[in-house]
A protein has these predicted regions:
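Charge-rich, low-complexity N-terminal segments
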Residues: 1-104
Length: 104
């Protein structure tokens, strides 16, 4: 049985210093690579924005998968002060084809 689909957005503070190379911060590039690999396995999608030392992310998918993803993010040393901004049930996804889109 599949859980309910949800959309969850959060904001957090980055704990690393900005080091931009090739148009994207190197630590953010590592986060994106890991997120895309992990999210495609568990059918979680969304979009990540990073700017001025802050993350804003929207995650969509099966409720248990999204919540376990948020738990991993909350325990990730690169994030602090994780604040949930939205957590709602949805009928369909906006980001179904994006394992993790990046926005600047």
């Amino acid at each position: 049985m599949q859980n309910q689909l949800i959309r969850l957005t959060y904001a957090s503070t980055a704990t690393f210093k900005t080091d931009i190379k090739g148009g994207i911060e190197s630590e953010v590039a590592r986060i994106l690579l890991q997120s895309r690999r992990n999210n495609s396995r568990i059918a979680v999608g969304g979009v990540l924005h990073y700017g001025d030392g802050y993350f804003f992310q929207c995650l969509e998918g099966d409720e248990s998968a999204v919540k376990s993803t948020l738990q991993r993010i909350s325990q990730d040393q690169r994030h602090r002060d994780v604040q949930i901004l939205l957590n709602v049930q949805i009928q369909r996804r906006l980001f179904e084809d994006w394992s993790m889109k990046y926005s600047t």
